[in-house]
Amino acid sequence: MREETPEQPAPLRSGYTTGSCATATSLAAARLLLGGTTSDAVRIVLPKGQQVPMRLEFCRAWENGAEAGTLKDAGDDPDVTHGALVFARVRLSAAPGVRFHAGPGVGTVTRPGLTLAVGEPAINPVPRQMMERHLTQLAAEHGYTGGFEVTIGIEGGEALALKTMNPRLGILGGLSILGTSGIVRPFSCSAYIASIHQGIDVARANGVRHIAACTGNASEDAMRRRYALPEIALIEMGDFAGAVLKHLRKAPVEKLSLCGGFGKISKLAGGHLDLHSRHSSIDLPQLAGWAAALGASAALQQSMRAANTSQQALAQAHAEGVALGDAVCAHALRFARSIVPAEVRLEVFAIDRQGNLVGQAGEERS
């Protein structure tokens, strides 16, 4: 989960994806094999046509091939791979075409549901296309009619992967080589949202009919206590409730349980799909209004409006016997229902900071 960062006066700096790093290093290694030339940088073309220089840490002969490496620069994005060494080892082969292999620190797909087949190295389609295009052009320039065996690795990738969703997605042994544009946009969250979609797709492909989308570890633990769900049924949505709800339009499941902290669920109840404090805030007067509909006294409503936090407002309501937690979950369920297909049964749970259940609503109680 990403932490809120202070505002910065200067524009945030973009970086490059692991797919761009893999393209640059595989091109540099292949160029050394075919032309005998090396340098401390290589220029690649991104999917939208931009030409960018990529600095190399090394480019040298390796066994019966060549290898090159670059340090992943994610710009100002808090990417887990920022600063990691991405490297490519390339061998020439008699058969034409480009064949990809997972090196140290790059994972292998072990579950269906992803865009890659089981057993394939976790090198996504666009990075594969980028490497194929650059290597094919290089081969044509040198009159080379053979093929390439390309192994991509990330130094320390196996340990870094444990900080990502890869193990839950069934990508084992390391990280994925990612990217659709070749560029990392700071705080775009596109990779995180893509992993949410992948998590749902993998769950469906493996026969899971009930998923639980949770805002964090405490809410995941609450769902584990309530249901005997397999690990792949637990979707870490963080603040991106909209990523879950909208994806279910085209990839529905039988049942969705939404679980989060009371404050996050309050935002969802208020009609927000991005629950991060940068994009949505808790509406204390709205909470007081919902309490009023449940019979809250004028004094309680006033104290709730003046509360410091949603948790304080909740405690005030519960102290007077007003079931605010359940009401907030009911409002959140109605909003989620307006997005999710009717075939998906919904339920919503809210927890406090200790992970205790403070509210729930559902179309099916269990």
UniProtKB/Swiss-Prot annotation:
A GO term, aspect molecular function: cobalt-precorrin-5B C1-methyltransferase activity
UniProt xrefs under Gene3D superfamilies: CbiD-like
Domain of life: Bacteria
Enzyme's top EC category: transferase
Pathway membership, UniProt: Cofactor biosynthesis; adenosylcobalamin biosynthesis; cob(II)yrinate a,c-diamide from sirohydrochlorin (anaerobic route): step 6/10
Keywords: Cobalamin biosynthesis, Methyltransferase, S-adenosyl-L-methionine, Transferase
GO biological process per UniProt: anaerobic cobalamin biosynthetic process; methylation
Keyword NADP: no
EC assignment: 2.1.1.195
Secretion signal, residue range per the UniProt entry: none
Reactions it catalyzes: Co-precorrin-5B + S-adenosyl-L-methionine = Co-precorrin-6A + S-adenosyl-L-homocysteine
Family: Belongs to the CbiD family.
Protein's name according to its UniProt entry: Cobalt-precorrin-5B C(1)-methyltransferase
